[in-house]
Curated annotation (Swiss-Prot):
Major location (coarse): membrane
Induction entry: Not regulated by light or plant N status. Up-regulated at the protein level but not at the transcript level by medium acidification.
Pfam families: PTR2
Name this protein carries in UniProt: Protein NRT1/ PTR FAMILY 2.7
Length: 558
């Protein structure tokens, strides 16, 4: 795989000297990927083990810790939308990434202080004591400040890096290759964090573990800044949301106007006629008296829009139903991330006589399987499908496959948890602890299945948004997936709270609960959501599906 990238780099650089002069191209690849690697190691280094840190060092109850972690994850996923707007509208991607990486560095450094200074943490719980000292307001204030800074910095770089990296290339094929490497590096870095850093936190010290995250963040910041002279610096095109609002207002102003079938009646710049879908908004581009200056420019953008603006608006509208389906796809995954850690804490995590798997490291199974199947998909499955059918596997098809794997994973996890609860009911524990005499390895199969699903649906969602959104919203487009996932973390937090209020399935001690029933509810919801997604996919028509090396497909079968 690495040799493929090297070959692409040599070809691209030698074939297009003009790219060198204006920046961009494969010469930027090592800087972008190294930055991504360091920032992701830093972010996952503290985030993956946050639940355990809150429980062990800040005496937070297990379900409450899981909900806090979900809220933090949701914030990290929502910040990319703000970063994208700042990039598209005001500053460009490169400055936003630089500032965000520095903010992340400050947050992780402060979090390291909470681990190293005893005054910033409550006293640990005494052995066999039910009552534990709660953290003070000052201690919580410092902790939440650190988490907030780290979350803002992480969110500000996550998908902005994807856009900045893709913007360095002219060809769709090269952009697609970068996206594959982007996700591969993301999950590889997560795997490094989930093993080396989480193990350090659990078995050596939290200070050293968080310190390694600080070092990784500092390294990535230096690498990114040092590569600035090679980058293609994208110019902000103004707020894309203003353009979308103009379409709405212009269409409403002309709501009584008759939609014309004559292209001369529309203000066009590149597209001559608006499409027939969402015909009401075609009125926004309908020319009326004194709306166009003699030089052909628009007098008032809130009264008249171009056909291109109208079609860009329609593109965003078409994506919304699919985004809703993704919310219900990712909510179970968000819940599983939290509940798996709690399950791992009450299962036998021993491997051999002296090694014990950290509960926060369980997610490495998902990360590794995602990494592996991104490569398998890119090099084996997708080329085989193309050779077999003569068509590319579309982004929506990839997302649909991810839906199916997600449902399967929830079902398998429910079966595993039911087996664990039977062992608990029989009183089979390790010694006098509350740890069931059941190996944590039973959780590996469902985690692998989740990883396979993510290898399909996550890159598929990002590719869909990047290719279907207007060019002026490229940064916003790649952040949409992150925003949807952020909503999912909030949804999962609300769902956990609802289940706690209405059932006895999720007590603080899950040995006395029914987590398996929670997973079965998620399976039912997943099946219904898959049906909804298939209907939306069947009705959707691609706007920009193309490949540089093949003829463009006018109609794509879903």
């Amino acid at each position: 795989m690495a040799s493929s990238v090297t070959g692409d780099a040599e070809t691209a650089i030698s074939a297009d000297s003009s790219t060198k002069r204006r920046g961009g191209g494969w010469i930027t690849f090592p800087f972008m990927i190294a930055t991504l690697l360091g920032l992701t190691i830093a972010a996952w280094g503290w985030l993956l083990n946050l639940i355990v840190y809150l429980i062990e060092e800040f005496n937070v109850k297990s379900i409450a810790a899981a909900q806090i972690a979900n809220i933090v994850s949701g914030c990290i996923c929502m910040v990319p939308a703000v970063a994208a707007i700042a990039s598209d509208s005001f500053f460009g991607t490169i400055p936003v990434i630089s500032v965000s990486a520095f903010i992340s560095l400050m947050g992780v450094a402060l979090l390291t202080l909470t681990a190293s200074l005893d005054t910033l943490r409550p006293r640990p719980c005494e052995t066999a004591s039910i009552l534990c000292q709660s953290p003070s307001k000052t201690q919580l204030g410092v902790l939440y400040t650190a988490i907030t800074l780290a979350s803002i910095g992480t969110g500000g770089t996550r998908f902005t890096l994807a856009t900045a990296g893709a913007n360095q290339y002219e060809k769709t094929k090269d952009q697609g290759s970068f996206f594959n490497w982007f996700f591969f590096t993301t999950y590889l870095a997560g795997a490094i964090s989930a093993t080396a850093i989480v193990y350090t936190e659990d078995n050596i010290s939290w200070t050293l573990g968080f310190g390694l995250s600080v070092a990784a963040n500092f390294f990535s910041f230096l690498v990114f800044v040092s590569g600035k002279r090679f980058y293609k610096h994208d110019k902000p095109l103004g707020s894309p949301f203003t353009s979308l609002l103009c379409v709405i207002f212009a269409a409403l102003r002309k709501r009584k106007a008759v939609v014309s079938t004559n292209e001369k009646d529309y203000h066009n710049e590149s597209i001559t006629m608006p499409t027939k879908s969402f015909r009401f908004f075609n009125r926004a581009a309908l020319k009326q008296e004194d709306e166009v200056k003699p030089d052909g420019t628009i007098r008032n953008p809130w009264r008249l829009c171009s056909v291109q603006q109208v079609e860009d608006f329609k593109a965003v509208i078409r994506i919304i139903p699919l985004a809703l389906a993704t919310i219900f796809l990712s909510t179970p995954i968000a819940m599983q991330l939290s509940l798996t850690v709690l399950q791992g804490l009450v299962m036998d995590r021993r491997l051999g006589p002296s090694f014990k798997i950290p509960a926060g490291s369980l997610q490495v199974i998902t990360l590794l399987s995602t990494c592996l199947f991104i490569i398998v998909n890119d090099r084996v499955l997708y080329p085989f499908y193309q050779k077999l059918t003569g068509k590319h596997l579309t982004p929506l098809q990839r997302v649909g496959i991810g839906h199916a794997f997600n449902i399967l994973s929830m079902a398998v996890t429910a079966i595993v948890e039911a087996k664990r609860l039977k062992i608990v009911q029989k009183g089979h524990f390790l010694g006098s602890s509350s740890v069931a005499d059941m190996s944590v390895l039973w959780l590996f199969p469902p985690l692998v299945i989740v990883g396979i699903g993510e290898a399909f649906h996550f890159p598929g969602n990002v590719a869909l948004c990047y290719q279907e959104f207007p060019e002026s919203m490229r940064s916003t487009a790649t952040s949409i997936t992150s925003v949807v996932i952020g909503i999912c973390f909030y949804t999962s937090t609300a769902l956990i709270d609802l289940i706690q209020r209405t059932t006895a399935w999720l007590p603080d001690d899950i040995n006395h609960g029914r987590v398996d029933n929670v997973y079965w509810i998620l399976v039912i919801g997943g099946v219904l959501n898959l049906g909804y997604f298939l209907v939306c996919s069947w009705l959707y028509r691609y706007r920009n599906l193309k490949d540089d090396d093949h003829k463009q497909a006018a109609n794509v079968s879903h």
